[in-house]
Amino acid sequence: MSNSSINEILWTKHELISASKGKDLTTKFLNNKKIMGISIDTRSIEQNDLFIALKGKNFDGHDFLEKAIQKGASGVIVSRKDSALRYNGLFVKNTHAALINFAEFSRNRFKGKIIGITGSNGKTTTKDMAKIIFNEFGKTFATPGNNNNLIGLSLSLMKLPYN
């Protein structure tokens, strides 16, 4: 899910390269395009999203790069040099590690307050209620949906606006 509704640029080329220690092999990565959201799934990708080609047991995000570009991805993060060259992508050694590095970078640059909700039951409901309450006092960001694993948390942190 994209956070394009925030209407802010989420990442700059320099930040993505710095956080991932990636390489812009073609020097054309992003080419003045904006990153307004983050996606690892072409079924939900939106215009100006950054697509990260994760590899899993039953899938490889590199197989969906063409579709991501067709659907409006501004850029791609890849762990294959041939894909980086073909799609002007940012080449990283490991896209999973890059995702975690992006999350850490985003968390460190964020200057607002962060609240964590833990427990066995009711976390999503509590999070949704807290967001409604805190919205009354100012700008609020909450994890979209139910992203309670390492990939989901990392994606949520990557979507964290600057303020």
Residue map of PLM features:
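Phosphate-binding loop of NTP-binding sites
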Residues: 14-20, 98-163
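N-terminal leader/targeting and accessory segments in enzymes
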Residues: 1-101, 105
